[in-house]
Swiss-Prot record:
It catalyses: 2 superoxide + 2 H(+) = H2O2 + O2. Destroys superoxide anion radicals which are normally produced within the cells and which are toxic to biological systems. It is found in: Mitochondrion matrix. Belongs to the iron/manganese superoxide dismutase family. This is Superoxide dismutase [Mn], mitochondrial. Mn(2+) binds at H27, H72, D161, H165. Its EC number is 1.15.1.1. The lineage of its organism: Eukaryota, Fungi, Dikarya, Basidiomycota, Agaricomycotina. It comes from Ganoderma microsporum. Keywords: Antioxidant, Manganese, Metal-binding, Mitochondrion, Oxidoreductase, Transit peptide. GO terms for molecular function: manganese ion binding; superoxide dismutase activity. Binds 1 Mn(2+) ion per subunit.
Amino acid sequence: MAHVLPDLPYAYNALEPFISQQIMELHHKKHHQTYVNSLNAAEQAYAKASTPKERIALQSALKFNGGGHINHSLFWKNLAPAKSEGKGNGGALADGPLKSAIEQNWGSVDNFIKEFNATTAAIQGSGWGWLGLNPATKRLEITTTANQDPLLSHVPIIGVDIWEHAFYLQYLNVKADYLAAIWIVINFKEAERRLIEATK
């Protein structure tokens, strides 16, 4: 069954002024759509491949485009219109299991965000910053993946796209400004839902 581009759970301009409508339209309709199209093409080619060599040759396309589709599908749900703008619940972390786990690990939400942003900004080239649940220890950890690699070692709770297409048209080369702004539109309610689901 072919993969399809998921609808955004909000309008393209809903995350302004923190993420512009132009970025959201390009990111969703062009970049994510390309990952979906390329993943479908790679899977079709894999199904027709008749030799191990042909199947091996398709592995990188499957990983890259499959990861791009998985990561972005999670990313859109990870965002919400900003509460500070009176538009939604973005940026609002209420008392509950997620806030408690963050405070237990990092002392405060501010400390967590500082460490997350520093770790994510240090990625060389393109990639993703993650807050993930370590399935072995049941603890939250900050980690990164390169390019479009999906997070396989942890259960993803929050993912932040640090590819230039996610921020360059608005923030140019200043990753720090993008990383500061994105927390104002992070959907902590969705992140907490993932955490609760992962710890059942």
